[in-house]
């Protein structure tokens, strides 16, 4: 048996190799001058800078709300002259606020980011892949239906969203013609009412609406995002020019996120779940069940691996591109200008690994 000292040394060497394997490409890229990513040389502003983050109160995004409740965003206010304001609003409003420059960062799905930001020519950096939908969105059918046949039926959903994408993927997988299904464009907050009205054959909902309809209205599950793993991603996005002018902004955001999610795998998991459930106004067991439908990247190393996994993102992008182009969501912008990956010249939406890479290096 090796000594404790040798075991500790081995663990340190393994961790160092993992970090280097994840960050080395970016480092070599910077040596040869490739790419044009936002750097993360965080210098403290001379005067107080006020920036803001908008997050909808979805279950998988409640760590942000708890971080705000615990004062995580204000940790660097006095020492680094950066005041991060937290804005909680419905999902559509958070997206609109980001586009209108009312907030500088937003939590959003990859599909919604492309659908909304590319057409508006918004230059934005993805600095965190928080996780993936793993059952968090679902196609739900009335409990009175005894045979699933969606052809010729009407479905309520938020058009051109990740829920719309999920329905398209169901139709493709089951070789059902798109035109055989009618879409009733419905705001997410109105989905439960539309389902209960009985006017629709079904709805496409995300949690907490999906869980509510399954539990309280005996909705039947026809299809959910577990069938398309890692295609619907949840992202932390910031305006590129803001990150360039205020590189410390990313550290505040990343610190706030990990201050909560890292507790979900340790002895403080139960108390953290209870705190988030209280903010979401549901019981802890229900909260846990809904949280399990989101595959979280709950450590900095796991998150860095995710944002650098361009192979996974490119594979998902093949399906997303078809959806976006079929619905003409990006206007005249060519596909090559939509999304770019770490170490490449930034497109409109750029997966920028440097802030997270810097964060990982600093916490070791």
What are these regions (language model features)?
Residues 71-80, 227-228, 299-312:
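Short, solvent-exposed loop/beta-turn-alpha elements that line the ligand-binding surface or hinge
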Residues 68, 72, 93, 97, ...:
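Extracytoplasmic/secreted proteins, especially bacterial periplasmic and envelope-associated proteins
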Residues 246-331:
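Secondary-structure end/capping motifs
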Residues 112, 184, 189-281:
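Pocket-lining segment of extracytoplasmic ligand-binding domains
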Residues 320-364:
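Conserved C-terminal helix/tail region of periplasmic/extracytoplasmic solute-binding proteins
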Residues 28-185, 201-207, 220-222, 230:
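Short, glycine-/small- and polar/acidic-enriched structural segments
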Residues 22-24:
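C-terminal motif of bacterial Sec signal peptides marking the signal peptidase cleavage site
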Residues 2-13:
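Bacterial N-terminal signal peptides that target proteins for export
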């Amino acid at each position: 048996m090796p000594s404790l000292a040798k075991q500790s040394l081995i663990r340190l060497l393994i961790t160092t190799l993992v970090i280097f394997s994840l960050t080395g490409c970016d480092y070599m890229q910077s040596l040869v001058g490739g790419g044009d990513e936002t750097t993360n040389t965080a210098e403290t502003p001379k005067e107080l800078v006020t920036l803001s983050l908008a997050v909808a109160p979805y279950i998988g995004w409640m760590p942000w709300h708890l971080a705000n409740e615990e004062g995580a965003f204000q940790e660097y206010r006095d020492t680094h002259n950066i005041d991060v304001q937290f804005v909680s609003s419905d999902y559509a409003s958070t997206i609109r606020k980001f586009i209108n420059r009312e907030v500088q960062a937003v939590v959003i799905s990859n599909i919604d980011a492309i659908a909304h930001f590319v057409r508006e020519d918004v230059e934005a950096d993805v600095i965190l892949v928080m996780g993936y939908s793993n059952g968090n969105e679902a196609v739900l059918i009335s409990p009175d239906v005894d045979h699933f046949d969606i052809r010729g039926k009407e479905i309520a959903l938020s058009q051109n969203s990740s829920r719309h994408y999920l329905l398209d993927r169901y139709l493709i997988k089951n070789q059902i013609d798109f035109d055989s299904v009618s879409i009733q464009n419905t705001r997410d907050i109105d989905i439960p009412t539309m389902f209960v009205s009985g006017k629709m054959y079904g709805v496409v909902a995300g949690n907490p609406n999906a869980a509510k309809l399954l539990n309280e209205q005996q909705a039947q599950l026809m299809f959910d995002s577990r069938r398309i793993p890692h295609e619907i991603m949840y992202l932390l996005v910031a305006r590129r020019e803001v990150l360039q002018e205020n590189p410390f902004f990313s550290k505040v955001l990343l610190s706030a996120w990990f201050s909560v999610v890292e507790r979900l795998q340790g002895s403080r998991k139960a108390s953290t779940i209870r705190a988030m459930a209280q903010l979401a106004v549901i019981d802890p067991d229900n909260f846990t069940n809904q949280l399990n439908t989101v595959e979280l990247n709950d450590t900095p190393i796991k998150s860095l691996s995710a944002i650098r996994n361009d192979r996974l993102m490119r594979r998902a992008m093949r399906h997303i591109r078809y959806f976006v182009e079929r619905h003409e969501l990006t206007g005249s912008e060519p596909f090559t200008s939509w999304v770019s990956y770490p170490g490449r010249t930034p497109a409109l939406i750029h997966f920028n690994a440097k802030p997270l890479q810097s964060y990982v290096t600093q916490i070791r």
